[in-house]
A protein has these predicted regions:
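N-terminal glycine-/serine-/threonine-rich beta1-alpha1-beta2 phosphate-ribose binding loop
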Residues: 1-147, 235-240, 277
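Conserved anion/nucleotide-ligand pocket segment
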Residues: 7, 184-256
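Short catalytic-loop micro-motif centered on adjacent basic/acidic residues
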Residues: 132-134, 158-161, 184-187, 215
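Rossmann-fold NAD(P)-binding glycine/threonine-rich loop
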Residues: 138-153, 161-182
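Glycine-rich beta-alpha junction loops
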Residues: 10, 54-58, 190-192, 217-224, ...
């Protein structure tokens, strides 16, 4: 089994835990639809086991995961009637993990089980953890670095799902490499979300000889992720990360990027975990003839993320088995802001070869 810890028991954690229950059920396990990879190396999805969990919300701390994923403001799409996981949620240090305007929503608890990376590393070691998944809110710079330091000390692989740059920061990349610890990051690129659709459309336009005049991506949602992002001061790295997906396709071809705008545009509570993306692209084709693309994408935000995280966990465990350390190359397939960007086809081929253990 792959022993996993989760930092942040919000909608994304709920989707991952529900997905483990869903695919662990024989009725659904037969088809395994909805997964990018059935096996990664020797590991099926059923090899993943969540054994440690952290949050700062009083409504989740000290409750079993099977209750905590439905507590507070969680509004994830329901995949299964319930999950069966009695692991108790531990209190994490808050640091900058809760935006000022979110304190009433999160009901933060201020009695963490450990306050230093050294003390927290001991907890991870005692739990015999293989992989830690960072699900902190966007803008949690100090908190993410706290957990990165903890993973280095505990020699636990880290999956950084948010746009705080760890894998793509040479300083942290070296820390993980020197400690012999694998790392995937930064900022999860959902299975079929705004970023991957933007990337593929940008690639298609370029490869079919078109000039991209502008590429505008606007996203609206009603979960706590979107509410948190109402605080513009927490969005600097998020905007860099989302726009990197588009701009990097021009950089790879030695071209100047067009006008690009990508990021959250509004929080609408009634949408819940539904995310609505509006894409607006203007191109110039043969003879300078204009092409205009308007596209609307509506997805369940958190399951869209979980479908990638479940692969990342297994890639990290496979890397541990092989003695690999530092940022993994599959980050280019799984994340918006990897250390090295690639074209979609190249990233997919690399991920497929690793999953096949070639």
């Amino acid at each position: 089994m792959i022993r996993v810890g989760l930092v942040g028991i919000g909608n994304c954690a709920s989707a991952l835990l529900q997905g483990l229950e869903y695919y662990g059920n024989a009725e659904h396990n037969n088809s395994l639809r909805g997964l990018t990879e059935t096996f990664i190396g020797p590991y099926p999805i059923t090899s993943v086991e969540v054994v440690l969990a952290f949050d700062v919300d009083k409504r989740k701390v000290n409750r079993p995961l099977e209750e905590a994923i439905y507590a507070g403001n969680n509004c994830c799409y329901t995949m299964v009637p319930r999950i069966y996981n009695s692991v108790k949620v531990l209190c994490a240090p808050i640091l900058d993990g809760v935006s000022e305007h979110m304190k009433d929503s999160f009901c933060p608890e201020s009695s963490p089980v450990a306050e230093s990376p050294e003390a927290m590393a001991q907890i991870l070691t005692e739990a015999k953890l293989d992989v830690l998944v960072n699900y902190l809110p966007v803008g949690s710079e100090q908190a993410t670095k706290f957990w990165a330091e903890t993973c280095v000390l505990a020699k636990v692989a880290m999956m950084n799902c948010i746009p705080v740059f760890i894998a793509s920061d040479p300083v942290y990349a070296d820390k993980f490499r020197e400690a012999g610890v694998p790392l995937i990051g930064d900022d999860i690129k959902s299975q079929f979300g705004a970023s991957i659709v933007s990337q593929v459309l940008e690639e298609l336009a370029i490869d079919r000889g078109h000039t991209v005049v502008y590429h505008v991506q606007q996203n609206t949602g009603g979960n706590t992720d979107f509410k948190n992002m109402l605080n513009q001061s927490r969005l600097v790295s998020k905007k860099i990360s989302k726009e990197n997906v588009i701009r990097s396709q021009h950089a790879l071809r030695g071209e100047h990027a067009p006008f690009v705008h990508a990021g959250p545009s509004d929080y609408v509570e009634v949408y819940g975990d539904t995310k609505i993306c509006q894409l607006d692209l203007e191109l110039k084709g043969f003879g300078g003839a204009p092409v205009h693309l308007d596209l609307k994408l509506r997805v369940q935000d958190s399951p869209n993320s979980a479908g990638v995280v479940i692969d990342g966990i297994r890639y990290l465990k496979l890397a541990q088995d092989k003695g690999l350390a530092g940022p993994l190359d599959v980050s280019s397939f799984l994340c918006k802001h990897p250390p090295t960007a690639t074209r979609f086809g190249q990233a997919k081929a690399l991920a497929r070869s690793v999953a096949s253990d070639l």
